Regions:
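Hydrophobic alpha-helical membrane segments
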Residues: 1-342
Length: 342
């Protein structure tokens, strides 16, 4: 299969879902329900803990406040890590469907055994993006200061440029002066953003298949999986970009869900008052966004993610057969059961 033939990839994805002997629709419903209801539960927990912290005062309750604050901070992080494993399991489900293997809801657990490798790969990629951002900020600052874009900034700090103590004093103690400096530096932000994207987008597509490599070869390290992704996507990264762009409607839908989720903040910014308190407003828009996201996932996620799995199959070296011992096996539980029966 040719990665550049997006229609063929989509047809393969639809055929894989339709031909699956398991229950791909129920598996999708379980994934959507767990991910969205879990997010809602975490939001409710944070609200309850926040109210409890606000009403817990006094020196004698400092220990309780510390515990509640720790739980409030740690709960979203723990949930995010759990969702990484669930999302990886979801990718393994789609890869199984492309390989004509039966899937069922428990197949979603297949990503958790490789969660450590996924976290390490994410950390390495995050460190790389941070380095790119640091370079973009430094280069962008040089470009900004060396062009006429910085003339307003020079005019503002001209009188204080030779007196570092006075300059620091003005920056720390004069809010109006600080606002003028920030306003004069506004052109630097698009410069840095463009420089970052120029480098970060190609890097992103170099590592686009890391998750699938981790699933296929669970014993490989994160670095090995990243290297495999680089080799696999070489010469096909533009095809992956066009594949992403072909799903513009899906990503636009996700963006719309994000706008709705922050509808209370947007309306407040516009000066629109709602007939209930801020907590109710938050949850009205939050639940509405989750419902929209659930509908979008239900009708499109199987097709989209299985198409990406088909793209991985098209890029995977054909001389190397698909492994039979990887985490990607949705029927890993069936294999374990068979060994137990023996």
């Amino acid at each position: 299969m040719d990665i550049r033939n997006r229609r063929a990839l989509r047809r393969e994805a639809d055929a894989a879902v339709a031909a699956n002997t398991g229950d791909p629709r129920l598996t999708l419903v379980v994934y959507v329900a767990v991910s969205l209801l879990g997010a809602l539960a975490i939001a409710i927990l944070r609200t309850i803990l926040g109210n409890r912290i606000a009403t817990t005062g006094g020196l004698q309750n400092l220990g309780l406040q510390a515990i509640l604050t720790t739980i409030q901070t740690a709960a979203p992080l723990i949930w995010a890590i759990a969702m990484m494993g669930l999302d990886l399991g979801r990718q393994s489900v789609c890869l199984n469907m492309v390989r004509r293997r039966s899937v069922e809801p428990r197949s979603l657990l297949a990503g958790f055994p490789k969660l450590g490798g996924l976290i390490r790969a994410g950390f390495l990629q995050g460190a790389l993006y941070l380095l790119i951002m640091i370079l973009a900020v430094n280069v962008g600052s040089i470009i900004f200061m060396a062009t006429p874009l910085a003339r307003d900034l020079y005019a503002i700090v001209a009188d204080l440029a030779l007196n570092s103590e006075a300059l620091y004093e003005a920056l720390y103690n004069d809010p109006e002066f600080l606002n003028q400096v920030f306003s004069a530096m506004l052109p630097i932000y698009p410069i840095v953003a463009v420089l970052f994207l120029i480098v970060a987008i190609p890097v992103f597509y170099r590592y686009r298949m890391v998750n699938y490599c981790l699933l296929d070869q669970p014993r490989n390290s994160a670095l090995v999986a990243m290297g495999e992704s680089i080799s696999m996507t070489k010469g096909s990264r533009w095809a992956l970009v066009k594949l992403d762009l072909s799903f513009w409607w899906f990503y636009l839908g996700l963006a719309l869900c994000g706008v709705v989720m922050y509808g209370d903040v947007i309306l407040e910014t516009l000066g629109v008052a709602l007939p209930w308190n801020t907590t109710v407003s938050y949850y009205v828009f939050y639940v509405a966004a989750l419902v929209m996201e659930g509908v979008l996932y239900y009708f499109s996620l199987n097709h989209i993610q299985t198409t990406y799995a088909a793209a991985y199959e098209a890029l995977r070296p054909k001389l190397q057969p698909a492994p039979t011992g990887g985490v990607v096996l949705g029927n890993i539980f069936d294999l374990a059961k068979g060994q137990k029966d023996q």
